[in-house]
């Protein structure tokens, strides 16, 4: 289950452990509740969807899969 809290963070609850997902410009991070470690991941490690040569005018977008 997930929801966005008042601070704009994405809270993901997995079997009693709450993960807080922080999405900022160019970085993605998450930490557990209670906070143990903050992990910040550059978005460059996520695969970028590549369009075919028939669609050169469309901008590339980053997709994050959970």
UniProtKB/Swiss-Prot annotation:
Keywords, in A-Z order: Glycoprotein, Late protein, Virion
Cellular localization per UniProt: Virion
Name of this chain's protein: Protein I177L
Main subcellular location of this protein, as a coarse class: virion
Induction summary: Expressed in the late phase of the viral replicative cycle.
Membership in a protein family: Belongs to the asfivirus I177L family.
GO cellular component terms given for this protein: virion component
Annotated glycosylation sites: 11
